[in-house]
Curated annotation (Swiss-Prot):
Domain EamA: 105-160
Gene Ontology MF, one: transmembrane transporter activity
Organism: Rattus norvegicus (Rat)
Organism lineage: Eukaryota, Metazoa, Chordata, Craniata, Vertebrata
Name this polypeptide is given: Solute carrier family 35 member F6
Record PTM Phosphothreonine, positions in chain: 366
InterPro entries: SLC35_F1/F2/F6, UCP036436
GO CC entries: intracellular membrane-bounded organelle; lysosomal membrane; lysosome; membrane; mitochondrion
Range of residues in the leader sequence: 1-18
Self-association and partners: Interacts with SLC25A5.
Keyword flag Nuclease: no
Length: 372
């Protein structure tokens, strides 16, 4: 069935905004500007400030939800309303996981390439699958276990590509290894978030935009408050800011003031996450979860192509192999092979049936020709 213009628009919006989200965050990391107190130019390494911005973007999804709710009320549509009342504090545990995992990933993005960052996020299906078996009493079919094993192999290949790639002064080998490991660690926390959401939240049939918005609210408020103690926690050279603390929000604002393009990158990150969540949810509703997974895979290709074109990273052939293996593992885990196998079996069956019909017709025609 052909896609409608609206469905094409949603797919394009998801692909574009999802790519902008990662690329804008990496773009901000690449800027250098003076900080507070006349400090020398230094890189914009403020992962927790960026995470606060991302949660602000998620929080804005509540505005989109209430607009949909108002329109639904005018049309007497009750699909937006939850089936039963719920306590908003249900979202606090998954929001804490989201906050922790996102913050770790922004730290990791400072240490590794954007394409590796996007590819290694595929590790989430490994831990989601294992945790769903352990805590949700779910049984994985053999193809899903095979998908997990193939995904592990793909992660190893992507990691090897990072190890063997040429590294500049910005991304040393030790930083790249640490960054890759942090991304894997973050996926464990994100998988816990998904299991918590499925076990305690989704049974209330809450609209996804409302769920994202509430989690964004908790993440924004809590992480904003945590920026205060982070300003005083020493971390030596790990943080990358002049004061050597876990996060220097004041330095971030000073750098933004001296380099307006950083503000543009942050604005792109904040707005893109809101539109990405909206379009992703809409694609799942209008098309399918499989389509959303395919578009997310294409997003990795777009990010990779842009980072290579902009010279942000060096091409390594192993990354192609690793990406293809990850793609195969993700497709198997999500059941994308089933419609493909069904299509192939139909194509295989039809020529065989046609051949059998021809033989039957041929056999039936021969006696007639002979008698005539």
């Amino acid at each position: 069935m052909a896609w409608t213009k609206y469905q094409l628009f949603l797919a394009g919006l998801m692909l574009v905004t999802g790519s902008i989200n990662t690329l804008s965050a990496k773009w901000a990391d690449n800027f250098e500007a003076e900080g507070c107190g006349g400090s020398q130019e230094h890189s914009f390494k403020h992962p927790f400030v960026q995470a606060v911005g991302m949660f602000l973007g998620e929080f804005s999804c509540l505005a989109a939800f209430y607009l949909l709710k108002c329109r639904a009320r005018r049309q007497s549509d009750s699909s937006v309303e939850p089936r039963q009342p719920f306590n908003a504090l249900l979202f606090l545990p998954p929001a804490l996981c989201d906050m922790t995992g996102t913050s770790i990933m922004y730290v990791a993005l400072n240490m590794t390439s954007a394409s590796s960052f996007q590819m290694l996020r595929g590790a989430v299906i490994i831990f989601t699958g294992l945790f769903s078996v352990a805590f949700l009493d779910r049984r994985l079919v053999p193809s899903q276990w095979l998908g997990i094993l193939i995904t592990i192999a793909g992660l190893v290949v992507v990691g090897l590509a990072d190890l063997l790639s040429k590294h500049d002064s910005q991304h040393k080998l030790s930083e790249v290894i640490t960054g890759d490991l942090l991304i894997i660690m973050a996926q464990i926390i994100i998988a816990i978030q998904m299991v918590l959401e499925e076990k305690f939240v989704y049974k209330h049939n809450i609209h996804p935009l409302q769920a994202v918005g509430i989690e964004g609210f908790f993440g924004f408020v809590i992480l904003s408050l945590l920026l205060v103690p982070m300003y005083y926690i020493p971390t030596a050279s790990f943080s990358g800011n002049p004061r050597g603390v876990l996060e220097d929000a004041l330095d971030a604002f000073c750098q933004v003031g001296r380099q307006p393009l950083i503000a543009l990158a942050l604005l792109g990150n904040i707005s893109s996450i809101a539109f990405f969540n909206f379009s992703g949810i809409s694609v799942t509703k209008e098309l399918s979860a499989t389509t959303r997974m395919v578009l997310d895979t294409l997003r990795t290709v777009v990010i990779w192509a842009f980072t290579l074109a902009l010279g942000w990273e060096v091409f390594h052939p192993l990354q192609i192999l690793g990406f293809l293996i990850l793609l195969m593992g993700t497709a198997l885990y999500n059941g994308l092979h089933r419609p493909l196998l069904a299509c192939l079996s139909r194509r295989w069956r039809h020529p065989t049936q046609e051949g059998e019909q021809e033989r039957l017709l041929g056999d039936s025609r021969t006696p007639i020709n002979e008698t005539s």
